[in-house]
Curated annotation (Swiss-Prot):
<feature type="transmembrane region" description="Helical">
    <location>
        <begin position="77"/>
        <end position="98"/>
    </location>
</feature>
<keyword id="KW-0249">Electron transport</keyword>
<keyword id="KW-0408">Iron</keyword>
<keyword id="KW-0349">Heme</keyword>
<feature type="transmembrane region" description="Helical">
    <location>
        <begin position="33"/>
        <end position="53"/>
    </location>
</feature>
<dbReference type="GO" id="GO:0008121">
    <property type="term" value="F:ubiquinol-cytochrome-c reductase activity"/>
</dbReference>
<dbReference type="Pfam" id="PF00032">
    <property type="entry name" value="Cytochrom_B_C"/>
</dbReference>
<keyword id="KW-0496">Mitochondrion</keyword>
<keyword id="KW-0472">Membrane</keyword>
<keyword id="KW-0813">Transport</keyword>
<dbReference type="GO" id="GO:0006122">
    <property type="term" value="P:mitochondrial electron transport, ubiquinol to cytochrome c"/>
</dbReference>
<dbReference type="InterPro" id="IPR048259">
    <property type="entry name" value="Cytochrome_b_N_euk/bac"/>
</dbReference>
<feature type="transmembrane region" description="Helical">
    <location>
        <begin position="113"/>
        <end position="133"/>
    </location>
</feature>
<feature type="binding site" description="axial binding residue">
    <location>
        <position position="83"/>
    </location>
    <ligand>
        <name>heme b b562</name>
    </ligand>
</feature>
<feature type="binding site" description="axial binding residue">
    <location>
        <position position="182"/>
    </location>
    <ligand>
        <name>heme b b562</name>
    </ligand>
</feature>
<dbReference type="InterPro" id="IPR016174">
    <property type="entry name" value="Di-haem_cyt_TM"/>
</dbReference>
<dbReference type="GO" id="GO:0005743">
    <property type="term" value="C:mitochondrial inner membrane"/>
</dbReference>
């Protein structure tokens, strides 16, 4: 009798995706982050579902409903902080996952890469809407500033913003629709993740060497399931340390003040994981130019496969490209720091230089390094 996991129509799909999947024998811990993102997504959906049971999406009660969750609901405080800090963990894993794709040339799997970019945009949209829901000062003003960026679109901009707001300012209609979208988007993300995996399993995983590993595969279970469990344990440990010891470390104190349309906070800034894009937006004095730079800072990932000039896929054996990659990482950290600083003398110029460097490294330096390294191969 055939094993049920190989014959049952449903279990067979799971078997081919997570158990008998042929995986390269040499993939490192950088390949753990895909499964960690899956765990983060499931955690966010579960905690979010429980929060939605007690949350009310009305401007008069939203803030107090979040307070009620933390004070009166059994274990409400831990569910709320797991959800808030779980988002931070999600983005840490997401950035590392994208970085690993860049470093090892995984972007040559075009369908997988493009679905990944759509996923990145969707997750960012979901996180932004989630930040608006507690209806604190930063929620309200963050929503006002970011949605207002659409008014930079010529001709239809103002109408578009008012259509999204459902009125002439961020108000009850905006909060209600943001809650509806914030609830539905994770399930759309889940569907996209399945498509992402479907395309990945068409080609098989990449590996650190960047060369085909068809002749040297091992089953996913038990080798990589055990390896992934170690990643899960480390992720959950870090998340619990954050939640139980300093749950507000990554949040903004202004969000503990109820939203007040008549009082603007001194520094409006998004959550830490959007600061790099926010810094790029602020570094351009023109509104439309800033919005375009903001969108391109993420969308630039889509043209990276076209900018690949090297004869080698991975950066493992390409020291010049490695230098450019780590310079890019340092530049993104600089942008993240600048995004959280006030708009005044030293920070403005640092932000502008870091923004120029960001686009230069991707569009100019990495392709040139690839060509130089191709010449090294002739020696």
């Amino acid at each position: 009798m055939t094993n049920i996991r190989k014959s049952h129509p449903l279990i067979k799909i799971i078997n081919h995706s997570f158990i008998d999947l042929p995986a390269p024998s040499n993939i490192s811990s950088w390949w753990n982050f895909g499964s960690l993102l899956g765990i983060c997504l499931i955690l966010q959906i579960i905690t979010g579902l429980f929060l939605a049971m007690h949350y009310t999406s009305d401007t008069t009660t939203a803030f107090s409903s979040v307070t009620h969750i933390c004070r009166d609901v059994n274990y409400g405080w831990i569910i709320r902080y797991l959800h808030a800090n779980g988002a931070s963990m999600f983005f840490i894993c997401l950035f590392i996952h994208v970085g690993r794709g860049l470093y090892y040339g995984s972007y040559t799997f075009l369908e997988t890469w493009n679905i990944g970019i759509i996923l990145l945009f969707t997750v960012m949209a979901t996180a932004f809407m989630g930040y608006v829901l507690p209806w604190g000062q930063m929620s309200f003003w963050g929503a006002t500033v970011i949605t207002n960026l659409l008014s930079a679109i010529p001709y239809i901009g103002t109408n578009l913003v008012e259509w999204i707001w459902g009125g002439f300012s961020v108000d009850k209609a905006t909060l209600t629709r943001f809650f509806a979208f914030h609830f539905i988007l994770p399930f759309i993300i889940l569907a996209l993740v399945i498509v992402h995996l479907l395309f990945l399993h068409e080609t098989g995983s990449n590996n650190p060497s960047g060369i085909s590993s068809d002749m040297d595969k091992i089953p996913f279970h038990p080798y990589y399931t055990i390896k992934d469990i170690l990643g899960f344990l480390m992720l959950i440990s870090m998340l619990l340390i954050l939640v139980l010891f300093s749950p507000d470390l990554l949040g903004d104190p202004d969000n503990y003040t109820p939203a007040n349309p008549l009082s603007t906070p001194p520094h409006i800034k998004p959550e830490w994981y959007f600061l790099f894009a926010y810094a790029i937006l602020r570094s351009i004095p023109n509104k439309l130019g800033g919005v375009l730079a903001l969108i391109l800072s993420i969308l630039i990932l889509a043209i990276i496969p076209m900018l690949h000039t090297s004869k080698q896929r991975s950066m493992t054996f390409r020291p010049l490209s490695q230098c450019m990659f780590w310079l890019l990482v340092a530049d993104l950290l600089t942008l993240t720091w600048i995004g959280g600083q006030p708009v005044e003398h030293p920070f403005i110029i640092i932000g502008q230089l870091a923004s120029i460097l960001y686009f230069s490294l991707i569009l100019v330096c990495l392709p040139i390094m690839g060509m130089i390294e191709n010449n090294f191969l002739k020696w």
